[in-house]
Amino acid sequence: MKAQSAFSDQFPYLITSWESLFKLNQGLHDNHSKEVSMNRFRPNIVVQGVDDLEKMTGSDLSCDEGDYRFGLRKPCKRCKIVTINQDTGEIMEPKEPLATLVKLKFSDAIKGAFFGQNAILLSKDCAIRVGDELKLSS
């Protein structure tokens, strides 16, 4: 399979969820910090209806139509770039949202600030469409 990806880190895809962002923003609010937008994390794909996406390592995310399937390989460890507002260049309180992400840890075994899942495409080339119905399987 031939694949190309620009500006990627270790994996070609970063998948995040609106539920994870909501949980993070609740934590930021509780810490009296400003909320952040999804563009702060620069995901390729954002899904809705998946709680605790960061805990889903080893699962597959696929289109109900069977057109494509992603393998969720590991939670994405976040660096200090997420402290920078992508629209203004303003730096948040130097430790946010990283400090809150650490507090929201998804596992006692792994330390750090994580948001989203690094993923690979397990199926043929495909078109991903806004509104696709997805299913999560282990």
Regions found by a protein language model. Give the residues of each.
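Metal-cofactor-dependent catalytic cores
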Residues: 1-138
